[in-house]
């Protein structure tokens, strides 16, 4: 049996299918040409990804970019979170004094001070002589009984105020003739006391309250009736003392 030269073997991926289809026919045909190729089979499942290839060579440098123009100003952003408190800075220079504040309430009474020693003024002097004082003149008392502050001056016969306030002045005189005594404050006559002689010896007195300022002077004087004496048992006394300081 001669085999025709037109028959060619199958190829490609369809070989397996053609082989399977041709198995029944081959049992019947003992000789002859191959059959017609069958239809293409269904595509197989996708294969797995292959392994990474080798790193390629370094590329050429790119073209330099052209600087762009500045864009418009953006919108104001939201305030950020407050930061941590910083360290205290150096102390600044002192400011100008402020205005005085309102007056506060009265405080508690303080400890009692040495009021008595700071506000004392007292004296007592006597006139010890049998001679009458000069008429129409100041009367000097030449013997000091007490004068701790030295506010009475025996040389001038005047008391000088050093502690302003209310004072009391008093005198007691012995006289053997008519007597008029004037109590003077600075250049003014404050009070006059006159006593006319009825017996061989008499006593008269007078007193006055005066409010004095620092530097005021107080003294006694007589007029033509000047029968004042000062002998043992018949003294003439002039006293003054501070009652209430200002």
UniProtKB/Swiss-Prot annotation:
Keywords: Collagen, Complement pathway, Disulfide bond, Glycoprotein, Hydroxylation, Immunity, Innate immunity, Repeat, Secreted, Signal. GO terms for biological process: complement activation, classical pathway; innate immune response; negative regulation of granulocyte differentiation; negative regulation of macrophage differentiation; synapse pruning. Gene3D superfamilies: 2.60.120.40. InterPro entries: C1q_dom, Collagen, Collagen/C1q_domain, Tumour_necrosis_fac-like_dom. The modification 5-hydroxylysine is found at residue 76. It is found in: Secreted; Cell surface. Residues 99-108 have a biased composition (Pro residues). Residues 44-116 are annotated as: Disordered. Residues 116-246 form the C1q domain. GO terms for cellular component: collagen trimer; complement component C1 complex; complement component C1q complex; extracellular region; extracellular space; extrinsic component of postsynaptic membrane; extrinsic component of presynaptic membrane; glutamatergic synapse. Residues 32-113 form the Collagen-like domain. O-linked glycans consist of Glc-Gal disaccharides bound to the oxygen atom of post-translationally added hydroxyl groups. Transmembrane segments: none annotated. Disulfide bonds join 180-194. The modification 4-hydroxyproline is found at residues 37, 40, 43, 46, 64, 82, 97, 100, 106. It comes from the Eukaryota. PROSITE patterns: C1Q. Residues 1-29 form the signal peptide. The C1Q subcomplex is inhibited by sulfated molecules, such as triterpenoid sulfates, heparan sulfate, or chondroitin sulfates. Glycans are attached at residue 76. The C1q domain is the ligand-recognition domain, which specifically recognizes and binds the Fc regions of IgG or IgM immunoglobulins. Core component of the complement C1 complex, a multiprotein complex that initiates the classical pathway of the complement system, a cascade of proteins that leads to phagocytosis and breakdown of pathogens and signaling that strengthens the adaptive immune system. This is Complement C1q subcomponent subunit C. The gene is C1qc.
């Amino acid at each position: 049996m001669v085999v025709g030269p037109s028959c060619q073997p199958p190829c490609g991926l369809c070989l397996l299918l053609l082989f399977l289809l041709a198995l029944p026919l081959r049992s019947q045909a003992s000789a002859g040409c191959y059959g017609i190729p069958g239809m293409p089979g269904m595509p197989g499942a996708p294969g797995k990804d292959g392994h990474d290839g080798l790193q390629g060579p370094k590329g050429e440098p790119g073209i330099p970019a052209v600087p762009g123009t500045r864009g418009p100003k953006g919108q104001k952003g939201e305030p950020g979170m407050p930061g941590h408190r910083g360290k205290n800075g150096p102390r600044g220079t002192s400011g100008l004094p402020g205005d005085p504040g309102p007056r506060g309430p009265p405080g508690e009474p303080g400890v009692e001070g040495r009021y008595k020693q700071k506000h004392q003024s007292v004296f007592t002097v006597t006139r010890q002589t049998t001679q009458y004082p000069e008429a129409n003149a100041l009367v000097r008392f030449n013997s000091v009984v007490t004068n701790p502050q030295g506010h009475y001056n025996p040389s001038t016969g005047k008391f000088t105020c050093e502690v302003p306030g209310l004072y009391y002045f008093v005198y007691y005189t012995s006289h053997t003739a008519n007597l008029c005594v004037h109590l003077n404050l600075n250049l003014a006559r404050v009070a006059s006391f006159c006593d006319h002689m009825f017996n061989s010896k008499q006593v008269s007195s007078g007193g006055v309250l005066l409010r004095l300022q620092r530097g005021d002077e107080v003294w006694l004087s007589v007029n033509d009736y000047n029968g004042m004496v000062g002998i043992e048992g018949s003294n003439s006394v002039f006293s003054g003392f501070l009652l209430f300081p200002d």
